[in-house]
Amino acid sequence: MHTRTVFSFLTFFLFCLASAQTYEIRYTNSYNGKVQTDQPSTIVLVNKNENVIVNTAIKEHKSTYPFEITKVEKPSNTVVSYAFLKPGKIISTSDRESVGKQTFELTPETKKILGYTCKKAVTKVNSNTIEIWYTQDLKLQGGPSVLGQNLGLVLEVERNKNSLITAQSVQKVRDAGIESILKGDIQTTDPLGYKDLLWKSRFTTLSIFDRETINFSDASQSNDSIKRYANGTIILKKVKFPTLAEGENIFTELRQQSNGDAYDRTGTVFVIPQDKEKSFFDGLEKGAKTLPAYDNGNGKHYYGVVSTENYSPAMEMMRFFTAFGIGNFNHIQLKGKNWQTISPYRQDITELKPSLSGKELWVGVFIGNYDKGGHTVSLDITIHKSDQNVYKNNVAIPLFNTLNIMEMAGQDYSTMFNKDKGLWVEFTLKKDLKNAQLRYTTTGHGGWENGDEFVPKTNSVFIDGNMVFSFIPWRTDCGSYRLYNPASGNFQDGLSSSDLSRSNWCPGTVTNPNFISLGDLKAGKHTVQIKIPQGPTEGTSFSAWNVSGVLLGVQ
């Protein structure tokens, strides 16, 4: 990428305006016959030398960043795109070929638009049918997009018979009114780099981990920015979340590869609430047994898994499962199998926004493994301004998380479901909670023939003693991810281990949470109980269930 000044463009542009008559065409957008008044109108400045495509918001200096201005140079039909990423940051790219490659079916149909006789041309773009109405009366070429630049002056474009952009006025102008916008230095880049920079400028990225190792080794050490626990199986970093406004969506995105471990492993991305006297961070620093213990009567104590008056468990953002050996074991060859090189995991976590907004919190990743090479992971959290507003809750309270994140530091497996009591949590609401939901994530484990990993089991959820939800968490799509699992073992029946259906998880995938409606909950004490008919042990083999729950709602 190199830098050039915009001065030459401005000089040439102003020269063009002075030497050739310029027309300003204003367009309106409509969808299914309804004018889209919430969108700025497209403006095209056309003369014999070049076209410039902007909109009313840009011309009036009211556009939000990022925004684009497109110029079509004539007679070469070179498309020059300018992206204004933020104040003082402009990039551009040039395309000399796209206009010339356009093909159209020219039809005999005609109609009048603004008094001009228009002809119809039809083309297809990415399976979309585009109808273009253009006039040759003005002896000009241009339009509201790069489509049809060679046909004439495009006055109407219709896509798939429902989306329409139509010219509302055509007038001669002396002053284009955009000179003050095009100021400063411009960085030129290739088309792919341009698209990437423009795309990434549309959202905020919190880069948390970049190719960090998660392994099992006594040599794993913390540094100034990243803490490591449980022999390197947990990595942790403090993250400052910006204030998240209504209408902003938040995603977590993790990329993982094997760095030596060939097996499918349980993984989780989590955040540590610090709203009470004790937190999960205390357990990491001082040992799991310093955290509150849960006792269901089976003789074991499960530390740090349930909320108490003085303790909040780790809040799970995303449950994921590593594939069998992706990346490090791609040398294993099978005919017709072209292995993927990285496992991507991405999940919308907007419902957790109330517990993140404006706070500085520890964010961690755990992968349960006993391999010195282990895994490499990169983690980003992205924030997007969006018209989609599915989650309207302003409360997110972690109630339980039985996934033993500190497994390699002595935290026991979640085998509490071998008793009828299962998991039982008492919590207190200080205010009424409307439209309450339980964000419930569950996966069954026990990797032998009769283990709960491979045996469907009913999960039942009770609120204040009443069953509100019951289902069998079961994934039957695991075979879809075979190409992420090069080290998966193959059986005599023609199946591979990664093909097998499991209790709500597959190697190489995310496990989605269930959103269980609870209605309105009054202020005061409540209980939540999870019951699962956990299978019995066989020798040294046992089953366990990793369940996490976050209470959502509006206060």
Residue spans for each PLM region:
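Extended soluble regions of mature proteins
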Residues: 22-199
